[in-house]
């Protein structure tokens, strides 16, 4: 347990905070604090004036000495127990298709391949009618407490419930843990993970000054610099302004070092191979680690493709965001990591990135899903995209009957993502012995409001006709780790 005391947020609110680190500077000591029940992106260095000593301070409790293990519990398992364990392991390792009773490759028509792993579960009938909320009675069907879809950041939920969930994680399997994280928006798989102190104070990238959110393994000497200069084209980093300006006079790169595969009047997409452009991709991963707490890969970039979205002007193509994708994903993921840079957030770029990843899946003829766990902001972005995409299809005139499988084929989403989105929106109901998709009044109203808003502001969408891209084919050596 760390030292707990009350500190003032930047808006003046008093919150309980953990002191993670202390450093001594010329102007006095400063404290690196994590605000309890808040996301780690709000961690910051504060001076002593923002600490409130009028409240009781919670001191760390001394660790209890470990009990010595006796020899009683170290007996070898009996032969019968070993036989039972072997039998259980044989049962578990059986072929999944045989366990579920599915008949594989027997007279099936060709269709886009699905994502692997747990992304495809058969949970609903093949075809379901679409009806309005007034057409059926909801007796016997559990209602949501509110028609609104609550997207709750896990960091703002009750602290007690979080601790109970964390204790329960110890009893979960890895697959169950991943499942919990992808639906909760947690930033890390390990709840006991030690906080990494944010090592950079401020970035200058192009015309923007940016405050980092998390730790990133830049050189240790950078932690003492007041500002870090990052070239917005080649992503090289400097802690000295003179060195940065000298670099800018020599650097000739004006766009990501890859093939431009999409261009419209607003944005461009570049495909960058991590094996061919290792330095640039590593610099990109270092930069994104400042804003993605769950990101662990920043050195071995060979097995990944990076799809970078840029805006254009007379000086060049300015990086807005990107997503990475494994060259050969065993689980069938169509996206490994996604980021919109903070200076471009809340402008609709995240939706364009997600939409573009599904356009690539459609071109490949596959069903895709993002890699788990999703960050809190990533989960919100995907849920919004899934909701809007499915409602658009269901609202098409003349569409009276549709199945989850058909929705997946139309959108390149996995059936699991389709099913979960319908459940979150409270659109699945059991009616007269069948499951039906219900377009609730709230969903229809929100869809109309979004269309009106798009007419006023103008919605930007990916135009599939402008995508000049074929699914790349890689050799075994080019899609493996560079070990």
Swiss-Prot record:
EC numbers for this chain: 2.3.1.48, 2.3.1.-
The family this protein is said to belong to: Belongs to the MYST (SAS/MOZ) family.
Protein name, as recorded: Histone acetyltransferase esa1
One GO term (biological process): positive regulation of heterochromatin formation
UniProt cross-references to SUPFAM superfamilies, sorted A to Z: Acyl-CoA N-acyltransferases (Nat), Chromo domain-like
Subunit composition and interactions: Component of the NuA4 histone acetyltransferase complex.
Catalytic reaction(s) noted: L-lysyl-[histone] + acetyl-CoA = N(6)-acetyl-L-lysyl-[histone] + CoA + H(+); L-lysyl-[protein] + acetyl-CoA = N(6)-acetyl-L-lysyl-[protein] + CoA + H(+); 2-hydroxyisobutanoyl-CoA + L-lysyl-[protein] = N(6)-(2-hydroxyisobutanoyl)-L-lysyl-[protein] + CoA + H(+); (2E)-butenoyl-CoA + L-lysyl-[protein] = N(6)-(2E)-butenoyl-L-lysyl-[protein] + CoA + H(+)
Renumbered zinc finger spans (C2HC MYST-type): 228-253
UniProt gene name: esa1
Bias kind Basic and acidic residues: ranges: 57-69
């Amino acid at each position: 347990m760390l030292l707990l005391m009350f500190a003032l947020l930047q808006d003046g609110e008093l919150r309980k905070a953990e002191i993670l680190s202390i450093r001594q500077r010329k102007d006095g000591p400063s404290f690196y604090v994590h605000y309890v029940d808040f996301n780690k992106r709000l961690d910051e260095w504060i001076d002593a004036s923002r600490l409130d000593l009028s409240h009781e301070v919670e001191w760390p409790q001394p660790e209890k000495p470990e009990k010595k293990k006796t020899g009683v519990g170290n007996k070898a398992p009996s032969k019968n127990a070993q036989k039972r364990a072997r039998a259980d392991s044989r049962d578990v390792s059986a072929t999944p298709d045989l366990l579920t009773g599915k008949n594989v490759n027997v007279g099936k028509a060709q269709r886009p391949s699905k994502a692997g792993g747990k992304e495809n579960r058969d949970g609903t009938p093949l075809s379901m009618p679409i009806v309005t909320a007034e057409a059926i009675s909801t007796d016997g069907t559990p209602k949501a407490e509110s028609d609104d879809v609550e997207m709750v950041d896990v960091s703002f939920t009750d602290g007690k419930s979080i601790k109970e969930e964390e204790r329960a994680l110890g009893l979960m399997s890895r697959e169950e843990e991943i499942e919990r994280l992808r639906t909760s928006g947690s930033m890390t798989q390990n709840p006991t993970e030690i906080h990494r102190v944010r090592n950079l104070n401020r970035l200058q990238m192009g015309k923007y000054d940016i405050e980092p959110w998390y730790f990133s393994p830049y050189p240790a000497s950078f932690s003492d610099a007041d500002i870090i200069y990052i070239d917005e084209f080649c992503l090289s980093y400097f802690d000295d302004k003179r060195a940065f300006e000298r670099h800018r006079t020599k650097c000739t790169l004006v766009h990501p070092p890859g093939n431009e595969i999409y261009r419209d009047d607003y944005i461009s997409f570049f495909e960058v191979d991590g094996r061919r452009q290792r330095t640039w991709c590593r610099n990109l991963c270092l930069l994104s680690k400042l804003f993605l707490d769950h990101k662990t890969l920043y050195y071995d970039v060979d097995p990944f493709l990076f799809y970078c979205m840029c805006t254009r002007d007379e000086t060049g193509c300015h990086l807005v965001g990107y997503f990475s994708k494994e060259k050969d994903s065993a689980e069938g993921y169509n996206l490994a990591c996604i980021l919109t840079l903070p200076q471009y957030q809340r402008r609709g770029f995240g939706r364009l990135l997600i939409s573009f990843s599904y356009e690539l899946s459609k071109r490949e003829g596959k069903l895709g899903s993002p890699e788990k766990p999703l960050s809190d902001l990533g989960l919100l972005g995907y849920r919004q995209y899934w909701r809007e995409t499915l409602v658009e299809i269901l609202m098409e005139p003349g569409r009276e009957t549709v199945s989850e499988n058909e929705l997946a084929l139309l959108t390149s989403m996995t059936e699991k993502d389709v099913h979960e989105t319908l459940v979150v929106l409270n659109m699945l109901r059991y009616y007269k012995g069948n499951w039906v998709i219900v377009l609730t009044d709230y969903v229809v109203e929100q869809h109309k409001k979004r269309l009106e808003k798009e007419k006023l502001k103008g919605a930007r969408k990916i135009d599939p006709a402008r995508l000049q891209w074929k699914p790349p084919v890689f050799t075994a050596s080019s899609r493996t780790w560079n070990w």
